[in-house]
Amino acid sequence: METVATIQTPTKLMNKENAEMILEKIVNHIAMYISDESIYSENNPEYIDFRNRYGDYRSLIIKSDHEFVKLCKDHAEKSSPETQQMIIKHIYEQYLIPVSEVLLKPIMSMGDIFTYNGCKDNEWMLEQLSTLNFNNLYTWNSCSIGNVTRLFYTFFSYLMKDKLNI
C-alpha cells in the first residue's frame, strides 16, 4: 500500500516538523539521484533528451557539492535563527537564482512565473508539496526531479519571504 505524505489542511504543511521532513526527503533524493553518474551516461536517451532541452542542470543544483547537501541537512536539525538565515541565504544565492534563470523560467507558463516570482498562490504550492509520494522516489526520472526542484524553489521562497530582503 502506497503512502502519500498526507497533510490535513494546507496550512499545517508549514509547521516546523512537516516542512523539515519534506525538505530533508527532497534534498536526500536529489543528492542521491544526481550523485549517480551512471544515470547521466551518454548512452541514456532520456538524459540526452533532457540535457538537449534544458542544458546540464546538475551543476546548478548540487552535482558533487557536499556543502549544499550538508547545509540542507543542517537546516532540518535544530539550529539558531542566525544559522538558518545563513543556510537559506547560501541556498538562495548559490542555487535557486541560477536554477530559476536557467532551468525554471524557460519551462514555466506565465501563470507559473507569476506564482513563483511572488509566491502569490501559497495554497497551490502547499497542495503540490502535500501530495509528494516518498515511497516511490527510486522511480523518479529527470523530469520528476525538475518538477520537484520547482517546488523546492517555491518552498524556499515561501520560507524566505519575511526573513530576507534580497
Swiss-Prot record:
This is Protein OPG069. Myristoylated. The keyword Lipoprotein applies. It is found in: Host cytoplasm. InterPro entries: E7R_orthopoxvir. GO terms for cellular component: host cell cytoplasm. Keywords: Host cytoplasm, Lipoprotein, Myristate. Belongs to the orthopoxvirus OPG069 family. Transmembrane segments: none annotated. Signal peptide: none annotated. It comes from the Viruses. Induction: Expressed in the intermediate phase of the viral replicative cycle.
